[in-house]
């Protein structure tokens, strides 16, 4: 199964390239004239991870996406009408950190935002961890919860409480808090056993579980 999926990645990348707009962002639907913020972050993350795992990724597409992300980061303003607006910003920052181009100033500004959502807090902590600042990530996590209220969002971040728990799970893995990660992993597994799940839940849960398995199986756990 893994080999089959791996062989599909080059074709998937080619299909994703076709959704990139002149702005560097990516459309949710093929042919749409508008970039979707969350989808742009997801596709960017996929491209970065593919590149890090040895796949050939278009440098031009990736560079254009990075410029789009950085502009969106700088243009970000809080939006009281949409509570998870900060989560979108945190995801942008995470993807840029993953690419090795962290926007440290924007990360610090978002961290100091009053009433930062729990979802944004977890994702931003991941960004700090990926950027090599695990001490800051750990400080943030100490004040975050995992008891996300049940919800299912059909737009914006396409979120749900199981997806958000998966984000928290990966954050705990990144900061090497394996006991906490194991606890959340059980909750994520229970949520995913209900028989149906959203694409976001599958994507984030699979990635987080794989990260946890990698740490546990290799013993690659470091302390600062």
What do the PLM-derived regions correspond to, one by one?
Residues 1-224:
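Large, well-folded core regions of big proteins
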